[in-house]
Amino acid sequence: MNDSVDLSAIRVGLHDEIFQGSQPVLAGIDATSTYCYLLAAEDHRDRDTWAIHLLDLRARGLHPDYTVADAGSGLRAGQKIAWPDTPCHGDVFHIQQEFETLVNIWARIASGTRAKREALETRLANPRRRCHDDILMVELAALHQLEAGAHQRADDLRTLARWLERDVLSLAGPERRTRQEMYDFIVDELHQREHEDPPRIGALRRALLNQRDDLLAFAGVLDEKLDAIARTAVVPHHLVRATCLLHRKPDSSTIFWQGWNRLHAAMGRKFHEVWAAVSQAMGSTPRSSSMVENLNSRLRTCLTLRRHLDGGKTWLGLLQFFFNHRRFVRSRCGERTGKSPREVMTGHNHPHWLTLLGLGPLQPLRV
């Protein structure tokens, strides 16, 4: 049943690897409909394993414009075999999480150094102590210096992480070229601080350096959409970009409505059309494979009841079928409410999933 569905309507695929214990489960989801077209437990997650599954999906009509995935080498190498000309955009979530982890580590280091300094000051203030002050004072001075340095590093890293998240990798941001300049600035700042913590800061800097084009690929897609909106609505491009940037502000803030009024005055009756088009363009430009993580959270309640995945192909296939044919009771995306992922993807209705399994039509409820 899962293999009979035509996948040609999928334009953006989200790929990731989830795990049950130490066993990888390869997953692929349509970014628009959340239709899960790949859910397979395998012994390996290397290039050949991914390539075999993606080639099978290609035979079923899957030819996405691009995919979104993390920096996994096996996943990306497998895609190169299946779709040599299909771009694989970077997943911004993982690099942001890695940066946030580094910030938290240095925040804990700074907090620990402060605790040591406060303990030593308490010891020095004790009138009953019986020791020389000279050694303790030297130690206290060293702790003051270490604490100041640790807090400074933590603050610097936190600032860089916020810039990366809110100014560079955010949907509501500048054009791609400007993002690249800001991205390179952050990498350069990390390089200047790398000597302070080579293993951790160095690893993050290298990851950012190697993934720049993949992580910022979404910005190129968004730029093209905004350019198309400006041409269609016949409005200056900078006003369309300003409309995009206005999405940064909460609609409960004064600055949001001030910006809203300025743009409305500049574009007149076209503003509402442009606003709706920009909102739709931003909503249809994925930057991460987080929907796979969402699928993982739904699967987890089932996976935790099993210590292994023996017979996993059939069992996971049934779960995949259930998730693809169960209708959404509610959703933030209005077009999904009351429809199943398959119905959203294909545009055609289907019977209840129990009926599709051959269990007959649903019986009316008896009062």
Q: Residue spans of the language-model regions?
A:
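Short amphipathic alpha-helical "interface-anchor" segments enriched in bulky aromatics
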Residues: 284-309
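Catalytic-core elements of nucleic-acid end-processing and repair enzymes
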Residues: 116, 120, 127-264, 276-280, ...
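RNase H-like nuclease fold core
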Residues: 1-85, 92, 102-112, 130-141, ...
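RNase H-like polynucleotidyl transferase catalytic core
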Residues: 86-103, 272-288
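C-terminal domain-tail junction helix/linker
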Residues: 155-158, 162, 166, 170, ...
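A polyampholytic, Gly/Pro-enriched intrinsically disordered region
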Residues: 106-124
